[in-house]
A protein has these predicted regions:
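Phosphate/NTP-binding elements of NTP-utilizing enzymes
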Residues: 1-213
C-alpha cells in the first residue's frame, strides 16, 4: 500500500507544479507565500527523486550570496520542519540539508560569483533561483545548459521566484513573457496566500490609510 500525503500550497500554484515543464515560477510581492511554497516543493521534489532511486543535487541559487546567511537555506529548513514526513526523510545540519538515504543533497550558490563553478557541481536535478529579479541574462544563459539531466518520466528543471520591479529584467523577458507551453509562470500576491500573516495585514491596512498613493 502506497501512503499519500497532502502538500499545502496556495491553490494558484497547483497548476504550476502539475504536468511536465522545463521552467516553473511565480512572481509577486511579500506575503504571497511564493518563497516558502517553492522551498517546500523543492524538498518534496527531492523526496520524490530519492524514493525513486534517483540521486543528485537540488541547487538553490540567488544572484547575490556572500555566505549561507544570504541563501535560501533557512527557508528550505523551515519548509522541511513544517512537514513531519519531510523531516523524517532529511537530515538537517547548521550548514547542510541532505537525505538520510544519501541520494539527495541541497547546494547553495550565488550566481554573480559562482556561476562558472555551477557547471561542475555534478548531477543537478533541479535549480531553484529565488529573488531572481536581478539575475542577468548572461547568468541564465550559463545556468540553463547545466540542467540537462533526464530519465524515464523526468528531466531537470529550472524554478524561478521573484518580486517584479522591471519589465526589462531578464527573468521577465525570458520566462514571464515566454509563449512556450513548457514554461509555467503565475502572478501571486497576498490575496492568494490563505495563511497571509496577521502582522503583514496590519501593515497593509496602515499603508492604505497613511500612504494611500
Amino acid at each position: 500500500m502506497v501512503a499519500t500525503v497532502r502538500v499545502e500550497i496556495p491553490d494558484k500554484l497547483i497548476p504550476i507544479f502539475e504536468g511536465e515543464a522545463d521552467v516553473r515560477g511565480a512572481k509577486g510581492g511579500r506575503g504571497s507565500a511564493k518563497t516558502r511554497s517553492f522551498a517546500k516543493m523543492a524538498a518534496v521534489k527531492g523526496y520524490i527523486f530519492g524514493n525513486a532511486g534517483i540521486s543528485g543535487i537540488i541547487l538553490c541559487a540567488r544572484q547575490f550570496m556572500n555566505s549561507l546567511e544570504d541563501s535560501s537555506l533557512e527557508e528550505v529548513k523551515r519548509a522541511i520542519e513544517d512537514e513531519p514526513w519531510l523531516l523524517a526523510y532529511y537530515e538537517i545540519g547548521d550548514k547542510y540539508i541532505k537525505s538520510r538515504d544519501g541520494r539527495i543533497s541541497f547546494a547553495f550558490a550565488g550566481l554573480d560569483r559562482n556561476i562558472a563553478s555551477i557547471k561542475s557541481k555534478g548531477r543537478l536535478l533541479l535549480c531553484w533561483v529565488d529573488e531572481a529579479e536581478p539575475v542577468t541574462d548572461e547568468a541564465f544563459t550559463t545556468l540553463i545548459p547545466t540542467l540537462r539531466e533526464e530519465g524515464e518520466g523526468w528531466s531537470a528543471e529550472l524554478w524561478v521566484t521573484w518580486n517584479p520591479k522591471r519589465k526589462t529584467a531578464a527573468v521577465e523577458k525570458r520566462f514571464s513573457q515566454s509563449k512556450s507551453d513548457r514554461v509555467k509562470i503565475v502572478d501571486l500576491n497576498w490575496r492568494d496566500n490563505p495563511k497571509f500573516p496577521a502582522k503583514l495585514e496590519r501593515d497593509r491596512q496602515t499603508d492604505l490609510i497613511e500612504r494611500p498613493d
